[in-house]
């Protein structure tokens, strides 16, 4: 786990190809110390090149670029790129997937693809499949023994017939 974290830090600093070549742990009884040696091969430092969006019809390139917040010439950071596209660690963060899913596009998918690596620069295409708009069909309360269902329905932010919104579903769950 620590080695994975170490490599992730390298990748955040532009070293996309960083890898652990060798590792060793040696205990020295005489001085009661442990020596840990990790040999890392950094590889080349990379930078973001051109980033193009494909398949987007609902949102403009400008809107998606401002949400992505990554400019040509910045140090490559694959971890940041993934967070700006879809941050699984924070369901209500501002990222491209949430932009789509908060506006009805439940089945949208956004995939970054490296299309060209030249010298130290990586060009990307962000391939977007928007899919159809999803609407809430039915909201059902189950397992409720203490409160009248009507009270729960009143507090929900989601209603049948509304466009799907991941944010509103999460808020409803939190508030209940």
Q: Model-flagged regions — what are they?
A:
Residues 1-176:
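Periplasmic polypeptide-binding modules associated with outer-membrane biogenesis and secretion
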């Amino acid at each position: 786990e620590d080695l994975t974290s170490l490599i992730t830090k390298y990748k955040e600093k532009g070293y996309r190809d960083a890898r652990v070549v060798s590792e060793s742990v040696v205990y020295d009884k005489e001085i009661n110390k442990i020596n840990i040696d990790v040999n890392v091969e950094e590889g080349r430092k990379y930078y973001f090149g051109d980033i193009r969006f494909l398949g987007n019809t609902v949102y403009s390139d400008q809107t998606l670029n401002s949400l992505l917040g990554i400019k040509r010439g910045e140090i490559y950071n694959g971890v940041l790129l993934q967070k700006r596209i879809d941050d699984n660690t924070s369901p209500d963060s501002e990222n491209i997937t949430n932009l789509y899913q908060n506006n009805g596009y439940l089945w949208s998918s956004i995939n970054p693809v490296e299309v060209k690596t030249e010298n130290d620069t990586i060009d990307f295409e962000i391939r977007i499949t928007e899919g159809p708009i999803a609407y809430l069909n039915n909201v059902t309360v189950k397992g409720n023994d203490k409160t009248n269902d009507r009270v729960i329905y009143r507090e929900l932010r989601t209603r049948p017939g509304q466009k799907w919104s991941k944010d509103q579903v999460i808020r409803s769950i939190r508030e209940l």
